[in-house]
């Protein structure tokens, strides 16, 4: 659950890291 929150935060405060956010979401789902 923490991972999901972090992913959301990343996409929220950094649109530039949208790619990173997408990867984070994928990783979170895999985990």
Curated annotation (Swiss-Prot):
It comes from Olindias sambaquiensis. Transmembrane segments: none annotated. This is Cytolysin Oshem 2. Circular dichroism reveals that this peptide presents mainly random coils as its main secondary structure. Its main location: secreted. It is found in: Secreted; Nematocyst; Target cell membrane. Cytolysin that shows weak hemolysis and weak myonecrosis. It comes from the Eukaryota. Keywords: Cytolysis, Membrane, Nematocyst, Secreted, Target cell membrane, Target membrane. GO terms for biological process: killing of cells of another organism. The keyword Membrane applies. The lineage of its organism: Eukaryota, Metazoa, Cnidaria, Hydrozoa, Trachylinae. GO terms for cellular component: extracellular region; membrane; nematocyst; other organism cell membrane.
């Amino acid at each position: 659950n923490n991972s999901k929150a972090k992913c959301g935060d990343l996409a929220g405060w950094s649109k530039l890291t949208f790619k990173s956010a997408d990867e984070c979401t994928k990783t979170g789902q895999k985990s």
